[in-house]
Amino acid sequence: MNGDRLREHLITLHGCRVVLRPMGESDWDVLARWNSDAEVLWYSEGDDVTSRLLEDVQGIYREVSQTGFCFIIEVGGQPIGECWLQKMNLDRVLTRYPGKDCRRIDLMIGEKHMWGQGYGSDTISVLTRFGFENEGVDLIFACGVADYNPRSRRAFEKIGYTVDQCIENQPGTKARYEYDLILSIGDYLKQKNAERDQVAGEAGRAADGSR
């Protein structure tokens, strides 16, 4: 695999409100802008970085793309963020779940005026469905969700993710605690069945009421 370029794909995913299109080599301008915004990076990164050089931005996404699917998040045809579904790369997770196909979801809403409107949770839902229903994975994680970013944690919990482990950092670090959240294929299917039963029940009650 060539780490000098993005490993591109042809997959486009549709959510209720977002479209996830393939990330490409033509997206560096917008990716560089988001990765130069100190407020965006405060929430999306675990360290104290406030800006990144273009070559660093390119290196990050190109590396991730070798073992994952990288997407640009769009709303109404306009890019608002990025995300990926990647093969797990953290030993602390892999040692807990040996022999399992573990993936991780990471995302950034780079357009700050779009924060708090549900686009993050819709993106997570789309990637989760893709991971379980198309990739056939066993477990999907959100890794290192910081205590100062409760909005991100709530977005994953809204889709059914729960805390798998809490990591306590050294005093004085940016995040005192970080959380790994998990969703298994079994729990995902239970949710899908429950949603299907609820829809069927509501349809049945509506039919009874029309008689």
How does the language model describe each region?
Residues 2-28, 36, 70, 74-211:
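Acyl-donor (CoA/ACP) binding surface of acyl/acetyltransferases
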Residues 56, 67, 88:
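Short acidic (Asp/Glu) patches
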Residues 61-66:
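Short loop/turn motifs at secondary-structure junctions and domain boundaries
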Residues 39-60:
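Conserved GNAT-fold acetyl-CoA-binding loop/helix
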Residues 25-32, 54, 58:
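An amphipathic alpha-helix signature
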Residues 30, 42-44, 71:
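Short N-terminal amphipathic alpha-helices
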